[in-house]
Amino acid sequence: MLPMITGFMNYGQQTLRAARYIGQGFMITLSHTNRLPVTIQYPYEKLIISERFRGRIHFEFDKCIACEVCVRVCPIDLPVVDWKLETHIRKKRLLNYSIDFGICIFCGNCVEYCPTNCLSMTEEYEFSTYDRHELNYNQIALGRLPMSVIDDYTIRTILNSPQIKNG
């Protein structure tokens, strides 16, 4: 008879413990009900990104000395640098520079180690395309000036949002 009573007591204790755990989880869920939604309607609204964000790489053709440091420090040997040696002036002349953003991991090593600062990270992150070959940017596409996200009219709705000010 005694083992039966202790069995009922253990069962009762386990039931109370389970109810307490369920109640704690439910209280956490209820604490989130009075918060504002976090969802951003992406094509129409955008968040302001950090100033350290690693977006599309901007390239300045005139500053590049074709030293290929960017290729050596890239973990996947991605930048393609074509150059020609000008023998009469003993310098390299850059012919072509391209980066395939379909393969790029945006580590920023090329930007950090460039001795002439001809590479810089922008805040552009929209690379959507139907053909992956369109992600291979040459020096003309890389030289295009980036559009500032702050000047975009869709940002203003997020800037005035109460959840950005409060949280």
Curated annotation (Swiss-Prot):
Q: What is the lineage of its organism?
A: Eukaryota, Viridiplantae, Streptophyta, Embryophyta, Tracheophyta
Q: PROSITE patterns this protein is in?
A: 4FE4S_FER_1, 4FE4S_FER_2
> Which gene is transcribed and translated to give this protein?
ndhI
Q: What highest taxon heads this organism's lineage?
A: Eukaryota
Query: Can you say where in the cell this protein is located?
Result: Plastid, Chloroplast thylakoid membrane
* Gene Ontology molecular function: 4 iron, 4 sulfur cluster binding; iron ion binding; NADH dehydrogenase (ubiquinone) activity; quinone binding
User: What disulfide bonds does the UniProt entry report for this chain?
Assistant: none
Q: What is this protein called?
A: NAD(P)H-quinone oxidoreductase subunit I, chloroplastic
Report residues binding [4Fe-4S] cluster 1. 64, 67, 70, 114
